[in-house]
Amino acid sequence: MSEQYSNDFKLNAAMAAIVLSGGVIGYAKSKSMPSLIAGSVFGLLYSTSAYYLSQGNSKVGLGVSVLASSLLGGVMGKKAIATSKPIPIILATGSAFTLLSSGKELYNIHKN
């Protein structure tokens, strides 16, 4: 793995764990299939991003991260505004941070 992208790898791996566990917890607490499905899908996207970053394919890894973060941020941002509940706010903030980090690195790759 490139040392340059190790922080992005860690961030995407952490987001994968957070959203996947959140989906499982949401299902366990309230039998929410949408939480389980969304947690699984976004967990898979962030895991895919982390995998590609660990293999040195930074363009694909960062691209998948930007995609996942944009989608999750949009969905959770809308939900955070509507409900003011802490979980959507945390997920929207985390995805925004991941989007900024991965987007900046992806921009730098394409700029050079």
From Swiss-Prot:
Pfam families in the record: Tmemb_14
Gene3D superfamilies, alphabetized: Transmembrane protein 14-like (1.10.10.1740)
GO cellular component: mitochondrial membrane
Coiled coil region boundaries: none
Tagged with keyword Nucleus: no
InterPro entries to which the protein is assigned, alphabetical: TMEM14, TMEM14_sf
GO biological process: regulation of heme biosynthetic process
Membrane topology according to the record: Multi-pass membrane protein
Transmembrane segments: 9-26, 36-53, 60-77, 87-109
Entry annotated with the keyword Transmembrane helix: yes
Main location: membrane
Keywords: Membrane, Transmembrane, Transmembrane helix
Subcellular location: Membrane
Family to which the UniProt record says this protein belongs: Belongs to the TMEM14 family.
Protein name per its UniProtKB record: Transmembrane protein 14 homolog
